[in-house]
Amino acid sequence: MADLAKIEEQLSSLTLMQAAELVKMLEEKWGVSAAAPVAVAAAGAAAPAAEAAAEKTEFEIVLMAAGDKKVEVIKVVKDITGLGLIEAKKLVDEAPKPMKSNVKKAEAEEIKGKLEAAGAKVELK
C-alpha cells in the first residue's frame, strides 16, 4: 500500500508534458492505445441523450407543405389554431412553418392526423 502511495505522489508531481510522455511510453511498452477507452466512453454518453429524446412529452407541430388540397388544409389549420381565414392561409402559404408549440404527444398526433387527412405534410419536432 505504501508503494502505491509513492506512485500516486510521483504521478501527481508530473507536469502535463511529462504525463503525456509517460502515456506514450506505456502505450508502446504494453501495445495498447489510450484512445480506445475514450471512444467507448463517448459512445456510452450518447445513449442517455438518445433516451432523453425518446422520452419527449411536448412537441412542436410543423406544417411542411399543404399538398394538393390547399383549401382543405387551410380549413383544418383555421380550426386547430383559432386563426382567422387570412392568417390561416398565410401560414399555409409560408410552409414549412411551425404551427403550434408545446403540445402533448396525444394531441400532437391527433392534429397531425387531421392535417394529413386534409392532404398536408406535417412533422412533429
Swiss-Prot record:
Q: Does the keyword Methyltransferase apply?
A: no
Keywords (alphabetical) are: Ribonucleoprotein, Ribosomal protein
The protein's GO terms of the molecular function aspect are: mRNA binding; structural constituent of ribosome
Signal peptide interval: none
InterPro entries, sorted: Ribosomal_bL12, Ribosomal_bL12_C, Ribosomal_bL12_C/ClpS-like, Ribosomal_bL12_oligo, Ribosomal_bL12_oligo_N_sf
Which cellular components does GO assign to this protein?
Answer: cytoplasm; ribonucleoprotein complex; ribosome
Which Cys-Cys disulphide bridges does the record give? none
Q: Name one GO biological process term.
A: translation
PANTHER family attached to this UniProt entry: 39S RIBOSOMAL PROTEIN L12 (PTHR45987), LARGE RIBOSOMAL SUBUNIT PROTEIN BL12M (PTHR45987:SF4)
State whether it acts alone or in a complex, and with which partners, per the record: Homodimer. Part of the ribosomal stalk of the 50S ribosomal subunit. Forms a multimeric L10(L12)X complex, where L10 forms an elongated spine to which 2 to 4 L12 dimers bind in a sequential fashion. Binds GTP-bound translation factors.
What NCBIfam families does the record tag this protein with? L12 (TIGR00855)
- Give the protein family: Belongs to the bacterial ribosomal protein bL12 family.
Role this protein plays: Forms part of the ribosomal stalk which helps the ribosome interact with GTP-bound translation factors. Is thus essential for accurate translation.
Instruction: Name it.
Output: Large ribosomal subunit protein bL12
Q: Which gene encodes it?
A: rplL
